[in-house]
Every structure is written in structure tokens, then in C-alpha cells.
Amino acid sequence: MKSQSKRTSRLFVFVGVVVAIIIAVLSWRYFGTGSDNNTSGAQQSARGQDTSHGGRRNTPLAPVQAATATEQEVPRYLTGLGTVIAANTVTVTSRVDGELMALHFTEGQQVKAGDLLAEIDPRPYEVQLTQAQGQLAKDQATLDNARRDLARYQKLSKTGLISQQELDTQSSLVRQSEGSVKADQGAIDSAKLQLTYSRITAPISGRVGLKQVDVGNYITSGTATPIVVITQTHPVDVVFTLPESDIPAIIQAQKNAEKTHAIVPVEAWDRTNKQMLAQGYLLSIDNQIDTTTGTIKLKARFNNEDDVLFPNQFVNARIKVDLLQNAVVVPTAAVQMGSEGNFVWTLDDANKVSKHLVTTGIQNSQQVVIDAGLNAGQRVVTDGIDRLTEGVQVEVVTPRSANTDANPASAEKAAAEAEGSTPHQGRGRPANAPARSTTAAEKS
């Protein structure tokens, strides 16, 4: 009985200890976790209060770049692809047959009209000239003798010693001799001309190309192979095409130029449209439209004194047909495309942005004409547009200067000093530098 009683008491003690341990663990978990949660909540609350009080002060304004809409005189240009052609092109060939004795030009050389280019062996033509001159001397002597005989016959005819028939025959001999002398003179002139043709000269001023025949070859007149080709490049022409819808504007520009005794300006630009090569004027317009392409050909002339234009070169021709007065102009970067059409972001005195729908006109890679929706003097955003919403306030910054770009270390120092001296983050940052990202510590 006693042993059983002891076992029962030990069991109760063991159960009591286990229950006490369980109660202690549950109590610790309950009360300890609640305290931690309260502490964490308090910290988060405090952090939230700090954020609520200081977050607005630390949030940076969106940096943008801006420009002011201005009134300008804007020229209207029509652009078409063109080809440079020589004002005149001459294929130099020989007019006489013979051996090519000499070439008196350098390939690619600029020559003037009348300059000696080549020589054909002149000896055969010198011989022909000598023969013609000898024949002339012979026939001239015959003519002189016939004229003296005619004078004697005329005297004898008066005395009746010769018949009238003999007198007429002598007169015919004189006329025949006169004809022979004239023929001989023609032969001499022909021989002299052939001798002149043996010296080949430049018919026009221009640039000679590559020689097509070498010295020593026998050349015949009328051969298909030329000696050289000369292209006149001072001046030079550009033939370009424009759509037929542009014809009225071109005709009107010509009429306006005629009234003021002026010219219609034309510019030649390179194939990338980045560099202007030369300035000239409209020379002529073709008299019919190409029905295949719906375009019309135009020809412009350029002095080309600096030889920037070369025959068969492709260029972009820009013809000025009008000049808009008091046009409102903004940078091209300011105009955006939306579902409602073109628009710009404008800035008020407080640097708050507002969206304005606009109608655009003439534009190029740098500026665009605003036909409606904007007035001169209004400021528009040109950079940082992707961060804008209606009515938001922004910070207008200026582009980074060349000195800042050249010295990155000084730029970073200046930016750091500016950030430390202003309540708005990022105010000392260069205009085209990216906005500083918020770290995890700042977020918490």
C-alpha cells in the first residue's frame, strides 16, 4: 500500500512539473511576442511619422529642360533627290587620220578652250598642202598666158585677121583657167584645214578625264573611241525631281522672283542631309510630267568654284519656294504625338506644366513651326517629358556646359555641393544626369 501511494504521488509531481513548463512556455510566447510586436509597431509608427513629416521635403522635383517659343521668318523648302551633271560634255575625237604623235594634257587636268590636247602626224597634210600650192602656181601661170592671148585676139578681131569663133574659144580658155585657179585655192584651203585638224585643241573649258588612246596608235576620223572626254564643271548643274503636287508652289516662286528680278535659291546637300555642299539657283523646269513616277524634273545651276560637286554625284536638292513671316517656332523635341494629336507641355510662372494640343507646320530636325495652339513667348518642355503629368511642378535646369563635360570630377563636386545646400534633392545635378535613385534605407 505504501509503495503504491509513493508511485501515485510521484506521478502527480511529474504531471504537475510538465504542466507548469507548458504554461510557462505559452505565457512567454504570448507575452513576449506581444511586447515585440508593440515595440515594432511603435518603431514603424515613429518611422511613418518621420516620413510623413519629412517625405515631402525630401522628394525631388522632376528636372526638365525648357525653351521659349519665338517668332521667326521660316523659309519653306522642297527637297528632292538629284544627280550632278556637267553643264557641257564633249567627247574629243580626231577629224583626220594619222598616227597620234603626242598628248599635251594630264588626266584630270583643268583646261581652257583652245588649249592644245593632242597632235596627229602632220607630214601627210603638209605634203598635200605643198602639192595644192604647186598646182595653183601652174594653173595661175596658164591663166595669165590665156589672158594675154585673149588680149591679142581682141586686137586682131578688130582688124578682121581672126574670126569671131577663135576669139570666143580663147575667152573660154581664160574662164577655164580661172576655174582651175579657184579649185586649186580650195585645195590649198582644204590642206591647210586638215593640217590644222592635226592639232587637236579643247573645244570648251573644263576637266579632262582619263585618256582613251595612247601615243603611237593610228587614229581614224569618225572612230567610236575618243581621245578624251571633257566635262564642264564651272558651272555645274543638278537635275532633281519633285512630286507633281509641288508644281504650283514652284511656278509661284518663279513668278515672285521675276517680279523682283531675283532668283529662286537652290541648295545642294550631301546624301545624309547633314552638310550643305553648294548654293545655286533654279535654271529650268521640264515641260512635262513623268507619268510613271508622277514627278517633274528640275535643273539647278551652281558655280562650283571649289569643285565640291562632281558629275554623276547624288545629292539632295532643296529649293526655297516661300518665306513664312512671324511664324511661331519651337524645338522639334518639344512636340509630342498622342492619341489626340500633336501636343506640347507648357510651363507657367510657377513651373507647373500643362498639356496643350497644337497644329504643326514646316519642320526639320531642329525646329518646328506651330500653326495653332501656342503663342510666342510661352515656355515649352524639351527634355524630361516622360516624367510629366498635368499640373505637376517641375524644376527647370540648363544643359551641362562644355567645361563641366570636360572635367567630370569638378562636375560631381559641384553637384554634391549643390545637393547639400538646397532642401530639394537633385537641384545641384547636371540637367542631363539621371535622377538619383532612392535607397532601401531612405524608403524605410
From Swiss-Prot:
InterPro entries to which the protein is assigned, alphabetical: CusB_D23, Multidrug-R_MdtA, RND_pump_MFP
Region (Disordered): 37-60, 398-444
Domain of life according to the entry: Bacteria
Annotated localization: Cell inner membrane
Gene Ontology terms for molecular function: efflux transmembrane transporter activity
A Pfam family per the record: HlyD_D23
Annotated keywords: Cell inner membrane, Cell membrane, Membrane, Repeat, Signal, Transport
A GO-annotated cellular component: efflux pump complex
Biased composition regions of type Low complexity, renumbered to the chain: 406-419
Signal peptide: 1-20
Gene3D superfamilies: 2.40.30.170, 2.40.420.20, 2.40.50.100, Helix hairpin bin
Subunit structure: Part of a tripartite efflux system composed of MdtA, MdtB and MdtC.
UniProt similarity note: Belongs to the membrane fusion protein (MFP) (TC 8.A.1) family.
Protein name, per record: Multidrug resistance protein MdtA
Species annotation: Yersinia pestis (strain Pestoides F)
